[in-house]
Each structure stands twice: as C-alpha cells, then as structure tokens.
C-alpha cells in the first residue's frame, strides 16, 4: 500500500490538551473531569472555530466537538482540494439519542420534535463539515464499534492509493452520565476508566514540506487469538514493511492500567497479552498506553 502522510492533526480530549495541526491553538480550559466518574473532554471556545451562531446553537456537544476538530484540521486548505471526508464513531451522538428517546416516552409518541433524531444520526458530523465548506466529495461514516476508526483510516488510505490527494479522516465518541451508568450496570467498565474525545487527521498523498508523520501500513484482525498467533501476525506485518521487532523504538498499546480487585476477566486477559508482547516481542522498546490519557471508548485508538 502507498505511504500516506499526516499533514495536520486536531484533537479534543481530556486533560485540557487541544492540539491543532502544525500551529496549535491551545485552550486553557480547566479539567472538567474532577467531579465525574469518567474522563471528560476539555472543550475549546467554539465561537473561535464555528462562526455561525445559529448553527452552533443547534449542535449537540459531540457534534460541536467533531465539527470543530474537522474545521481546525482543514486549516487553510481549499475545500476543492479535499478528496473525501471519512468519519468514525462507535456509539454516535448519545445526547441527541437520549433526548429523542426521552421525548418519545414523555409525549407518548406524539408531537415529537424531529431535530434530536436528525442530529443523532451517525453521519451528522461528516455531513455538517461538508455543508459548512460546500464539499461535494466522497463522504462516509463507519460505525464498526471498536474497529470504527481503523476502518475509516483504511478507507482513507485506499482512497489516496486510488488517486485522491487529500482526505480528512476523524473519529469521535462521547460519554454521558446515562451511558456510564448503563455500561457500569452491565459490567463493561470493571477495571476500566471510561473517556471520550474527538480527533481529526488530514492525510495526503505527497509528503509536502513538513509532514507530521508517515503511515506505512495498517493491519487489523479480530476474534480470539493466542499470544503466539498475535505475535506471529505482528512479526509478519513488520517484515512486510522491512522492519524487525528490535527496530521498534516506541510501543503504544491500548492497555488499561486502572487497577481493580474486581476487574473484568476479559480485560485481565487482554492486559496479560499486552504484557507478554512487551516482555517477549518488544523488550527494548519504550512502552506507553494511550488510554492513560484519554480513557476507554470505542474510537479511543484515534
């Protein structure tokens, strides 16, 4: 697959870091996660990014996060040069979904306001970015749970290989108090610190003058695999790209490090696989977990 270059990055996530591309616009918002049981994204002043006050007022929180990230990531690039907008989400616009369902119950299925339903659809964010800049290019949204972002990234890389010059790809998910309570009752958050966030990347065919990074390859696989099978697939992936395990300087994983005496068995097994890979496959690499910064959510890998 042809190498792809990351030209700009925009991110809204917990701990007050809002990095936008090569010229970051940092918002010194206070950490809003202190009084919540999950990591909440610290949001910028949207007036500086989404100029239309009427449009901004109608947007839900996650829509504003995603649209702001997308617009900042585009920067000064002309809309005509965008070959596609590809977004990913695991659960979509939860606040609007909850609002619509509550109205459905409160009003006994009569005289419903359609706006929350319209805003709750998964493709809202990609569509809003396209409408704001009148981008008539390819527009796709992936809702593949934990593989949503990887699916969007793969699609973007394939579009560039087919001839597109620039692709805007992003991922976003939000956590609400209702969603947190439901997931907690279902036992999905044992030993896990929940989070949320929105990220966008401007990918291009050409390296340009100051690319942030180069993506040489991507591989995903699902299902139940032993540590040996996973190790074998990683080794083959590296070899296809002309690398060996000892060449890897940084190993960034999705290991959850929150300790719990009643931790989920599946999460313990997953963490044990990460630890075996760190010990046996990449012992000389620097080991990091991105979930320490953003928490756990379907598109946290972005």
Set out the residue ranges of the language-model regions:
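Conserved "HGTGT" condensation-loop signature of ketosynthase/thiolase-family condensing enzymes
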Residues: 1-138, 143-150, 158-164, 172-302
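Internal active-site segments that recognize and position negatively charged phosphoryl groups
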Residues: 155
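Short aromatic-hydrophobic micro-motifs that form the base-stacking/packing surface
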Residues: 168
